[in-house]
């Protein structure tokens, strides 16, 4: 699940982890969004300029600011945007993992 949104969710998580210092799980637990502006890869290959979907826990101020800037914002159900998992092996051999809490579809398991 995810189609054209997967790469967007992964990029948001990656930037949070690499540039904003969030750990694996914090980056996944933070609010997610995706754009529907570009032509879809799958039939019927729709393009919805200016449209985006965002989770409500980003806050009303952010949602209002996006709308003021002309975005067509759809507010999704809480914890419903994005499906992510991540794993990291530290230089000391420690394995770290994280899984999205969204829709209870993922687990982080290591050995």
Regions found by a protein language model. Give the residues of each.
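Proteins synthesized as precursors that undergo proteolytic processing into mature forms
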Residues: 1-78
């Amino acid at each position: 699940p995810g189609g054209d949104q997967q790469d967007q969710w992964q990029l948001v998580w990656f930037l949070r982890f690499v540039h904003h210092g969030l750990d694996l799980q914090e980056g996944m637990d933070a609010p997610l969004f995706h754009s529907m502006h570009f032509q879809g890869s799958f039939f019927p290959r729709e393009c919805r300029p200016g449209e985006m979907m965002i989770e409500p826990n980003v806050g009303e101020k952010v949602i209002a600011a996006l709308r003021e800037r002309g975005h067509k914002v759809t507010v999704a159900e809480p914890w419903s945007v994005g499906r992510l998992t991540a794993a990291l092996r530290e230089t000391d051999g420690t394995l770290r993992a994280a899984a999205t809490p969204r829709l209870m579809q993922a687990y982080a398991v290591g050995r």
